[in-house]
Amino acid sequence: MKRGKKYRAAVARYDRAERFSLDRAVGLLKEVRYASFDETVEVHVSLRLKKNQTVRDTVVLPHRFRAEVRVLVFCKEDRVSEALAAGAAYAGGAEYLEKVKGGWFDFDVVVASPDMMKDVGRLGMVLGRRGLMPNPRTGTVSADLGAAVCELKKGRVEFRADKTGVVHLAVGKTTMDSAQIVENVDVFLSEMDRKKPVDVKAGFVRSISLSSSMGPGIWVVHKSEE
């Protein structure tokens, strides 16, 4: 893939083979950025996983950077007010099931009470391919609707390893304070370490890199190597 002049100039400002401390990597990412818009900062973590293993969970990042999250809650009528009071944009049962079935997607994340999952499951093909299907493992199927919605509104995000064993997660914006980006990355990495498969003894993390939307990747030293 041919890269533009600005990208090549950014790459020339540091040794791409070198691995930096997290603090320095974030600072360097800001130094070499060249885009005219507020880019998203992403962390990419390559994991040592067996073919039958995966990593999937959620984490609440301490510093929010996304636009307000629109939460749709599937629940019985007697729990609608509870969900809305917690901050859900929409809450209900049959009405919203039909709207989604008809192609309505004016929301960012879906929460469901356990007693609604039989009905929500019928939307598996519709919600699943968009990554919106509620799942107990990610806290989006919950009897405590208020807590589930509040966590999402506070900035809880899902992370999962792809087929190659790499986890990609947005952790900030380039205009954020560097310390906030560093803390978001630290919290995410700590949470991911806690979720590693039990039979992985050492070397769980192969490599870590940071990048902005348009910028080059910057290798980061994992804390176990510091």
From Swiss-Prot:
**Record's CDD domains?**
Ribosomal_L1
Highest taxon listed in the record's lineage: Bacteria
Q: Which UniProt keywords apply?
A: Repressor, Ribonucleoprotein, Ribosomal protein, RNA-binding, rRNA-binding, Translation regulation, tRNA-binding
- Which NCBIfam families does the annotation name? rplA_bact
Q: Subunit composition?
A: Part of the 50S ribosomal subunit.
**Which InterPro entries does the UniProt record give?**
Ribosom_uL1_bac-type, Ribosomal_uL1, Ribosomal_uL1-like, Ribosomal_uL1/biogenesis, Ribosomal_uL1_3-a/b-sand, Ribosomal_uL1_CS
Q: What does this protein do?
A: Binds directly to 23S rRNA. The L1 stalk is quite mobile in the ribosome, and is involved in E site tRNA release.
Q: Does the keyword Kinase apply?
A: no
What is the name of the gene encoding this protein?
rplA
The identity of this protein, by name, is Large ribosomal subunit protein uL1
GO cellular component term, pick one: large ribosomal subunit
As for family, the record states: Belongs to the universal ribosomal protein uL1 family.
Q: Which GO terms describe its molecular function?
A: rRNA binding; structural constituent of ribosome; tRNA binding
GO BP annotations of the record are:
regulation of translation; translation
State whether keyword rRNA-binding applies.
yes
PANTHER family according to UniProt: 54S RIBOSOMAL PROTEIN L1, MITOCHONDRIAL (PTHR36427), LARGE RIBOSOMAL SUBUNIT PROTEIN UL1M (PTHR36427:SF3)
**One Pfam family this sequence matches:** Ribosomal_L1
